[in-house]
Amino acid sequence: MPTINQLVRKPRKSKVEKSKSPALNVGYNSHKKVQTNVSSPQKRGVATRVGTMTPKKPNSALRKFARVRLSNLIEVTAYIPGIGHNLQEHSVVLLRGGRVKDLPGVRYHIVRGALDTAGVNDRKQGRSKYGTKRPKA
């Protein structure tokens, strides 16, 4: 326990909260070619690479991912949720935050049903999370 005098000399420091999705907290001014300090809930980007990767132990699968260059010129890895997708190189995608626990380095999700990304076909439940329209009765 510090003495009052020690606290007067060197006060307590508050913890710095680190963002879990840092690329969404950076804007870009293309006229001045300078990064700005503007946060956004989603960001648009262009897929530069689409592929699969294997998860950490103890899981086993081929998880779909895309390497995306965002509108603020930062390049990140994003997960493609749902069964099947139509993404390829140069597809324009919308990104949201949210990591994938068993894929190291994947801190973002691609929003299904927005921009060039199609919704998941034949999905009946939880459709809003996968950009699927209501089926005709």
Swiss-Prot record:
GO terms for cellular component: small ribosomal subunit. Keywords: Ribonucleoprotein, Ribosomal protein, RNA-binding, rRNA-binding, tRNA-binding. Residues 1-57 are annotated as: Disordered. Part of the 30S ribosomal subunit. Contacts proteins S8 and S17. May interact with IF1 in the 30S initiation complex. This is Small ribosomal subunit protein uS12. Pfam families: Ribosom_S12_S23 (PF00164). Belongs to the universal ribosomal protein uS12 family. InterPro entries: NA-bd_OB-fold (IPR012340), Ribosomal_uS12 (IPR006032), Ribosomal_uS12_bac (IPR005679). The lineage of its organism: Bacteria, Bacillati, Bacillota, Bacilli, Lactobacillales. One of its GO terms (molecular function) is rRNA binding. Signal peptide: none annotated. It comes from Streptococcus pneumoniae serotype 4 (strain ATCC BAA-334 / TIGR4). With S4 and S5 plays an important role in translational accuracy. Interacts with and stabilizes bases of the 16S rRNA that are involved in tRNA selection in the A site and with the mRNA backbone. Located at the interface of the 30S and 50S subunits, it traverses the body of the 30S subunit contacting proteins on the other side and probably holding the rRNA structure together. The combined cluster of proteins S8, S12 and S17 appears to hold together the shoulder and platform of the 30S subunit. One of its GO terms (biological process) is translation.
